[in-house]
Every structure is written in C-alpha cells, then in structure tokens.
Amino acid sequence: MNRPIFIGITGGTGSGKSTVARAIFESLPEKNIAIIEQDSYYRDQSHLALEERVKTNYDHPLAFDTALLTEHLMLLAQNKTIEKPIYDFERHTRKKEFEVIEPRDIMILEGIMILDDPALRDMLDIKIFVDTDADVRIIRRIRRDMEERGRTLTSVIQQYLTTVRPAHLQFVEPNKRYANIIIPEGGDNQVAIDIMVAKIKTIIQERS
C-alpha cells in the first residue's frame, strides 16, 4: 500500500474548512478517504477544574497537542492505525474513549493551526487555505458554538473579541503564505472544489 496522500485544509474559524473537506470527501466516493479534525487534538485538561479549563485560549497553537497529531500522521504514513482522541467541548477536555482511524489512500487534516508547526506542515502534500470574510466567519462561529457546543451568545462573542480574532491575525492569517492553494468563499466556491478534486484524482492516477 502506498503512503497516504495528506491534504491539509486550514483557514480562520468559521471559514468553511469543514465544508470544503466534506465536499472533497463526497466527491471521491470510490476512493478510501478519511477526515481528521485538529480540534480532536486539543490538550487533555482532565487534571484541571472546569473553571480553569474555560480560561484556556483555544485559539492559540499551544492549545493543541501538536506532537501527538504529528506522531499520528507519521504512523498513518507508515500505514499503521491510530487511536484518535475524542474531545468533549462542553467539559473542555478529552473523553476517555478514542476513535480508531485506519490509513486510507487520502487523509484530510482540517484545522486552524495545521500550517503553524513546521514538522506538521511538511507532512502535508497539498495545503489549502480557505479565505472567507471576517463577518461571515463570526456568524458561523456563533451558530456552531451555540448549536453544537452548548455555548451562550455572550460567551462566544467575548471569546471572539479576546482570543479568536487576535489569534487569527497573529497566527492563522500569516500562515496563508504556506498554502499551495487559496480558496475564497469556502464551501460556496464549487469551481475551486472541482479543481481540487481533479488534482487529487490526477495524483492518485500517477501513483497507481
């Protein structure tokens, strides 16, 4: 079995990273493909009280266990299975359970900080930056955090102003320079997604 093709999809919070990843996933139904979310690799905080966990800046590179994520990608590159963490966003720590991920022909890694670490970045064969206006991103973030993560409107807005926006300007936006491809307007850009899928199919054909 060949080494998996690693595709990294990044961009600001609410930019449409997951939508692009899912669109690529669904456009390649005949191939073995899997998606890994960087959010699963937030550091374990079970040793902290809940009131301490909520103070963590989850939009900073240090919030992620990048060493573990890189190790897992290396194992997948060797066609070995991994035990991917499962993160509990209401309790702000990892669950005891994990998800077994087997190596596939195509592994999509999606997250806000996947281009920040050089070792992790160098493992990615294709690096995509999803570029979406800030006002669209904050609306999507509010909707997601309230509907899927049990957050209040006040807490989401406060977090955006104090950590999310500063982190985007300091870390996420500068990492755009490492991307091979920049997709404006995220999941709404079907033309860009179609081009990406065609490129992936070409790579697969060249390796077969």
Curated annotation (Swiss-Prot):
Catalyzed reaction equations: uridine + ATP = UMP + ADP + H(+); cytidine + ATP = CMP + ADP + H(+)
An annotated Gene Ontology molecular function: cytidine kinase activity
GO cellular component: cytoplasm
Signal peptide from the UniProt entry: none
Enzyme class: transferase
Keyword Kinase: yes
Main location: cytoplasm
A biological-process GO annotation: CTP salvage
Keywords attached to this entry: ATP-binding, Cytoplasm, Kinase, Nucleotide-binding, Transferase
InterPro entries, alphabetized: P-loop_NTPase, PRK/URK, Uridine_kinase, Uridine_kinase-like
SUPFAM superfamilies: P-loop containing nucleoside triphosphate hydrolases (SSF52540)
Residues at which ATP binds: G11, G12, T13, G14, S15, G16, K17, S18
Its EC number(s): 2.7.1.48
CDD domains named among the record's database cross-references: UMPK
Pathway per the UniProt entry: Pyrimidine metabolism; CTP biosynthesis via salvage pathway; CTP from cytidine: step 1/3; Pyrimidine metabolism; UMP biosynthesis via salvage pathway; UMP from uridine: step 1/1
Keyword Nucleotide-binding: yes
Subcellular location(s) of the protein: Cytoplasm
Pfam family, one: PRK
Family affiliation: Belongs to the uridine kinase family.
Name listed for the protein in its UniProt record: Uridine kinase
Organism encoding this protein: Alkaliphilus metalliredigens (strain QYMF)
